[in-house]
Amino acid sequence: MSSQDLYANAATDKPLMQVKGLIREFKAGEQTIRVLHDINLTIHQGEMVAIIGQSGSGKSTLMNILGCLDQATAGDYQVFGQSVNRLVPDELAKLRREHFGFIFQRYHLLGDISARDNVSVPAVYAGMDGQARNERAEKLLSDLGLADKVNNRPSQLSGGQQQRVSIARALMNGGDIILADEPTGALDSKSGKDVVQILKDLNAQGHTIIMVTHDPSLAAQAERVIEIKDGYIIADYKNEDYQRPAAQPASIIDKHRKSAFGSFIDRLLESFKMSLLAMRAHKMRTLLTMLGIIIGIASVVSVVGLGKGSQEQILSNISSLGTNTITVTDGYPYGDPRRQYNDDNLTPQDAQAVADQPYVLSVSPQLNSNMSVRYRNVQEAASISGVGKDYLDVSGETLAMGQGFDEQSILRRTQDIIIDSNAHKTFFPTIANPIGEVLLIGSVPGRVIGVLEPNEGGFSRSVDTPTLYMPYTTMMSRLIGSAYIESFIALIDNNISSSAAESAISDLMTSRHGTDDFRIRNSDSIRQTIESTTAALTLLISSIAIISLIVGGIGVMNIMLVSVTERTNEIGVRMAVGARQSDIMQQFLIEAILVCILGGLLGIGLAFAIGELINRVGGDSFKVIYSSTSIIAAFVCSTLIGVVFGFLPARNAAKLDPVEALSRD
């Protein structure tokens, strides 16, 4: 029902508020206590009513029901002809927001915001335009003599001034019906008289005033007095001298109402502002709450970054096997019973057949042996590898000095050798450039024509053992006397799928040999294995780090539950001025999300600091590489933690009973 419809009902002879047979009971353990007994009363538009009674008489309970803060156990209560008995909480909030204004004995102002912002709170929930909201709040405060106090917080105001702010707040959305609970109870006599006069003036302007008091002198100021005792109305009479005004207050909220979306954004900003104020008011507690999130996010991001760095380092070392290579090795697959009878199956011709394929860039045959190598008076065991002219290309090795093998080296079976850095240090520790020096390999001399760059951590040769390379034809004929090779490495075109090339080479070799007396190793499969293994390890360690996040989330939930308890009175005030359950839930959920997002950002910053430290201290051994995916995931994760672990406290806040919330300090 719109404001216009409600006013139309009020303009007729129908009562503004009507109570019939109202009963209110409360549970006290296993007992049921009846506070109000068969209450019947009618209040018309523009009346000034005083409900008087001693403490425990039920007058405040009746006021709470009349103000839609509470609902009757039985009976009927109508406002503007509309029954409120079966209205849900948000529908009751709408009535409070658009038609009721509350003046409390203890003022119930929000301590962290200014007088202007306190007065504006009801209009935020009503969807009033921001500029109009501020202008009206300032005008109301000015009309009540507080023009110079609009920016003051409640702690900077006297009791009388705080009560005036409370009155201005009650009028913010129009305040058709003003409910005043002991409005002068906490004031000195002068301030009390001023407040009573303000209420009379408001009544003269057409506002319906309902005061709850135990003071007969205050009740005597009203047009009508309702006496209540032990939950029963014992008297209902009028003061004959009181002149009832005929005017009606204009509806304020309909003139400046925003769109539904604009109103939602306003409420969102209000929730955001209040969340920041709450966080600022408890800085240390907020920081400690964030700590679990900070550590968890930093751990996850650092572990993922370290895993990524390790993976990249390992994969870069695979370049020693070639960028995209397939190695064919002599012998039946492991576990095949034929393996023990025939292991000499690969020939240089097999390597050449593979080299002739269009998807193969180059091939290097290979065979290996361990032999004694001597240079002058230095003799050591070394690994000897016979390789093809394209070995440097397929292996990814690079020369530090000298040259590699060429076609003539293979055809003429030259006794040229290439040594690695270990052999250089072992046999020529004092010779910077050993090119041209001669080593004795067994009984065969070999002339050094090249030295390889150090390849620490690579996969092709031992880190410590000296390794010498010579043309495979030289090794076959001069060192081991064999017509067979142990393996060959094929460098595959990067535009070709390595799995397709592997299948094609397998088919070719099977066709040539008539059987599968060979084994194939794909460097890409090694890469995939390393990637999957690294990912699994990263996931495992991240799972442990995520436990910290969960603990941090539980910490957020605990602190938010404490915050809800501490701010119960604030929640009650917001509900009294018309906040929906969703508004309350939104406010506390935003606070939890803000704590987690801020904790997540600090955690990401800490992870960057840890990564920088590791990169500086670890050198080439450890590298932390951050990806945008992990950072975005961490940010999203911290947000989700705020939503998940902030939901329960936010829901508890939204489900609070307004009357119970207002009664707590």
UniProtKB/Swiss-Prot annotation:
Task: Give the record's GO CC terms.
Answer: plasma membrane
Under Enzyme Commission nomenclature, its number is: 7.6.2.-
State the compartments where it is located.
Cell inner membrane
Taxonomic lineage: Bacteria, Pseudomonadati, Pseudomonadota, Gammaproteobacteria, Moraxellales
Binding-site positions, ATP: G53, Q54, S55, G56, S57, G58, K59, S60
Name any Gene Ontology BP term. response to antibiotic
Indicate the enzyme's highest-level EC class: translocase
Which keywords, in A-to-Z order, does the entry hold? Antibiotic resistance, ATP-binding, Cell inner membrane, Cell membrane, Membrane, Nucleotide-binding, Translocase, Transmembrane, Transmembrane helix, Transport
> Oligomeric state and partners?
Homodimer. Part of the tripartite efflux system MacAB-TolC, which is composed of an inner membrane transporter, MacB, a periplasmic membrane fusion protein, MacA, and an outer membrane component, TolC. The complex forms a large protein conduit and can translocate molecules across both the inner and outer membranes. Interacts with MacA.
Q: Does the keyword Transmembrane apply?
A: yes
Indicate what this protein is called per its UniProt record. Macrolide export ATP-binding/permease protein MacB
The record's family statement is: Belongs to the ABC transporter superfamily. Macrolide exporter (TC 3.A.1.122) family.
Please list the GO terms describing molecular function: ATP binding; ATP hydrolysis activity; transmembrane transporter activity
Query: Record keywords: S-adenosyl-L-methionine included?
Result: no
Chief subcellular location: membrane
Q: Where is the ABC transporter domain?
A: 17-255
